[in-house]
UniProtKB/Swiss-Prot annotation:
Belongs to the phospholipase A2 family. Group II subfamily. S49 sub-subfamily. The keyword Secreted applies. Residues 1-16 form the signal peptide. It is found in: Secreted. Its main location: secreted. InterPro entries: PLipase_A2 (IPR001211), PLipase_A2_Asp_AS (IPR033112), PLipase_A2_dom (IPR016090), PLipase_A2_dom_sf (IPR036444), PLipase_A2_His_AS (IPR033113). Residues 121-133 are annotated as: Important for membrane-damaging activities in eukaryotes and bacteria. This is Basic phospholipase A2 homolog Vur-S49. Disulfide bonds join 42-131, 44-60, 59-111, 65-138, 66-104, 73-97, 91-102. GO terms for biological process: arachidonate secretion; lipid catabolic process; negative regulation of T cell proliferation; phospholipid metabolic process.
Amino acid sequence: MRALWIVAVCLIGVEGSMIEFGKMIQEETEKNPITSYSLYGCHCGLGSKGKPKDATDRCCFVHSCCYAKLSDCSPKTNRYEYHRENGTIVCGSSTFCKKQICECDRAAAICFRENLKTYNKKYKVYLRFKCKGVPEKC
């Protein structure tokens, strides 16, 4: 299991907001964010290619688009704070960038939870060369 963690760290990097995003995913889905989502479909984890395979993969596509809109905010490395109120994720508001990054992650974590019933194990470790089609625009 330790080797899997080391590989996952190399693949997705555990820095900045990725730590908070991982916690959100774990809290919302009760799934391990690294083993369940880092290589899922065509849009989760590093790189984005082709059409989303299903609703969960679409969550990742939308999340990537959200981050793209915030590229000046360094969304993968800029850490933020959040808390929960009555089970709901509430993003802190220390700066505009941190709040917006948190909101992107919040929306994706909720999207994953809302699509748990259609999570497809065959896409859990999906090889990107299988991803075909013209990618949608954000």
